[in-house]
């Protein structure tokens, strides 16, 4: 070993010991010929002092040190002189009196100072330097502890950790695939998996019964501020279980994770139905750290003459004290709504004497003005925001306004934790709504799956999949923490007939189903057990535990919001030779052979023989 001790673990009890340390120069200070450096390694920082005037060679070497030089230092641990202790660091009572110094690696001029703020693009370009800083390094190390804690829980429950393929065939799962050309099969492509969904179900058919994996997943989605094209899930699947069993195991995992940061999650975690969550909070990911619930006003305005409120849905959310906002702030709310694709955000101001003001109030009848404040629970000095239009989009706007109001008023305790299970979502949603929300609607039908096509309906709804499609409830559950969905799962379909019916509702024809999912349907014919599971978004979960706003902070080498890696400059063009070798431009032709569909290409020499 190049060192005998970890720098950050030295204490007063080590005084008198000869030690060899190795790490980086965090700081260098020169005080009248005596040189001090803060030596940093993975364990922390220790002060090293070069003070022997007789050892001119070591002093000369120390004079040449600069920030982030990688060095090895030998010396004796000593108690710091009286008055020189540093209570800010764990090693603040001691220092190492250096007797030798070896420079293991010099450091070029730094692109940014590690003890000063830097822009994200620069940080990601030099991520290996960024990770030398305390907070980024701590976040990555916490992630390792999170992995270990989850594995320990699942090992106690006899789960088997199994790796599933990361190059497979392209199957529609709700997002676009990343495609990989298959060089030995010109014109054909592998796909990087969006999830291990199909393989973990096959593992249940195989009799594994309890599977998990910390799985890498890939989705070619449109650029979003806090999404990554590659991400990680804690993926779990169990046979012979119902939703209650999966929720119980999940709560045990979550309890163990939050114990890492000293918080005990009260269990059982409360539950709320999907429909209730949408009605009260405008979202299926409600933040329950504060109130400000939405108020349904559709019936209240059922006879209104105000055309804006003559809509399928009218709802409101109250901003306490919001009537004092200046006009420019209220105008800013309109811009805020327009940025979210809406025409604006109607409002009524409740004056201190209870009278109503603002542009909407003058369009209301006397009866509406008289009863409005009581109906929505507004008090003098409050502002009432409204949204009117289609139910889903109007509620979504009010749900976003609710969170924005809470942020502006400081109503959210950043140290609080609020967990909730959102259960009983619909199995299907209109395909046009999914597309409008930026999702990929699988199939060509009027309906697509809310979660994915393999989610089972609640047993009592099985007979109404075709006749009452929009009302069918899924046997599914999402876990939400502080307004973030950190996991989601369901009981799966394990019968071929039900799976085929779901595919049909989604507009997948039999030929497409057989081509893309035939292997799964065939497996269901060989004694498939009832099964279900859940997947936790591991990046988001770890970010919450680390107190980070962005998942990029808990990923060792993340991409930007635009999907670019500033460090390696990926993605990058390929060479003409790579393009030729990959067969990416080959034109496949479908032929039927031995009841199987194969991809061949007329441009490949072996085909033309």
Curated annotation (Swiss-Prot):
Keywords: Aminoacyl-tRNA synthetase, ATP-binding, Cytoplasm, Ligase, Nucleotide-binding, Protein biosynthesis
Organism domain of life: Bacteria
Biological process (GO), any one: aspartyl-tRNA aminoacylation
Chemical reaction(s) catalysed: tRNA(Asx) + L-aspartate + ATP = L-aspartyl-tRNA(Asx) + AMP + diphosphate
Pfam family, one: tRNA_anti-codon
Site-annotated residues for Important for tRNA non-discrimination: 31, 83
Region span, Aspartate: 197-200
Signal peptide start and end residues: none
Keyword Transferase: no
Localisation: Cytoplasm
EC id: 6.1.1.23
Keyword check for Nucleotide-binding: yes
Binding site for L-aspartate: 173, 219, 451, 492
Record note on quaternary structure: Homodimer.
Protein name, UniProt field: Aspartate--tRNA(Asp/Asn) ligase
């Amino acid at each position: 070993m190049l060192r005998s001790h970890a720098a950050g673990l030295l204490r007063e009890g080590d005084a008198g010991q000869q030690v060899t340390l190795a790490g980086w120069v965090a700081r260098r200070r020169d005080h009248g010929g005596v040189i001090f450096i803060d030596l940093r390694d993975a364990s922390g920082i220790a002060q090293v002092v070069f003070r022997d005037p007789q050892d001119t060679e070591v002093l000369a070497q120390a004079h040449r040190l600069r920030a982030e030089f990688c060095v090895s230092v030998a010396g004796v641990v000593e108690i710091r002189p009286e008055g020189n202790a540093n209570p800010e660091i764990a090693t603040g009572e001691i220092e190492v009196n250096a007797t030798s110094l070896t420079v293991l690696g010099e450091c070029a001029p730094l692109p940014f100072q590690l003890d000063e703020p830097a822009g994200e693009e620069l940080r990601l370009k030099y991520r290996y330097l960024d990770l030398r800083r305390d907070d980024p390094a701590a976040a990555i190390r916490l992630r390792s502890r999170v992995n270990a804690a989850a594995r320990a829980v699942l090992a106690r429950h006899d789960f088997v950790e199994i790796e599933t393929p990361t190059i497979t065939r392209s199957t529609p799962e709700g997002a676009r695939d990343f495609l990989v050309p298959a060089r030995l099969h010109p014109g054909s492509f592998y796909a990087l998996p969006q999830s291990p969904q199909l393989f973990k179900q096959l593992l249940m058919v195989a009799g594994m019964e309890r599977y998990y994996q910390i799985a890498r997943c890939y989705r070619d989605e449109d650029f979003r501020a806090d999404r990554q094209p590659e991400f990680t899930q804690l993926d779990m699947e169990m046979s012979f279980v119902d939703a209650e069993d999966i929720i119980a195991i999940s709560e045990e995992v979550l309890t163990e994770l939050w114990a890492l940061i000293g918080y005990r999650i009260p269990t059982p975690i409360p539950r709320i139905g999907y429909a209730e969550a949408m009605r009260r909070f405008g979202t299926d990911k409600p933040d329950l750290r504060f109130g400000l619930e939405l108020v349904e006003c559709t019936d209240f305005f059922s006879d209104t003459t105000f055309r804006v409120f003559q809509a399928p849905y009218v709802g409101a959310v109250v901003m306490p004290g919001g009537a004092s906002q200046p006009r420019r702030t209220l105008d800013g709310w309109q811009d805020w709504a327009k940025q979210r694709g809406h025409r604006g955000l109607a409002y009524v101001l409740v004056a201190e004497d209870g009278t109503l003001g603002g542009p909407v109030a003058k369009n209301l009848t006397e009866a509406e003005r008289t009863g409005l404040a009581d109906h929505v629970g507004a008090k003098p000095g409050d502002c009432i925001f409204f949204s009117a239009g289609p139910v889903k989009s109007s509620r979504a706007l009010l749900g976003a306004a609710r969170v924005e109001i809470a942020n502006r008023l400081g109503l959210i305790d950043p140290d609080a934790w609020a967990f909730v299970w959102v259960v009983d979502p619909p199995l299907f949603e209109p395909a046009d709504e999914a597309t409008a929300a930026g999702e990929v609607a699988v199939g060509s039908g009027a309906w697509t799956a809310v979660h994915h096509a393999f989610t089972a309906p609640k047993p009592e709804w099985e007979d109404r999949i075709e006749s009452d499609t929009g009302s069918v409830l899924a046997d599914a559950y999402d876990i939400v923490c502080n307004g973030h969905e950190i996991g989601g799962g369901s009981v799966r379909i394990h019968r071929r007939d039900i799976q085929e019916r779901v595919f049909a509702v989604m507009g997948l024809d039999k030929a497409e189903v057989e081509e893309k999912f035939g292997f799964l349907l065939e497996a269901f014919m060989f004694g498939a057990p009832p099964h279900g599971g859940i997947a936790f978004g591991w990046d988001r979960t770890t970010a919450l535990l680390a107190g980070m706003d962005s998942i990029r902070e808990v990923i060792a080498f993340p991409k930007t919001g635009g999907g670019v890696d500033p460090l390696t400059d990926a993605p990058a063009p390929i060479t003409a030779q790579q393009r030729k070798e990959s067969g990416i431009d080959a034109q496949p032709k479908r032929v039927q052979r031995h009841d199987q569909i194969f991809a061949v290409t007329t441009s490949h020499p072996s085909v033309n023989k």
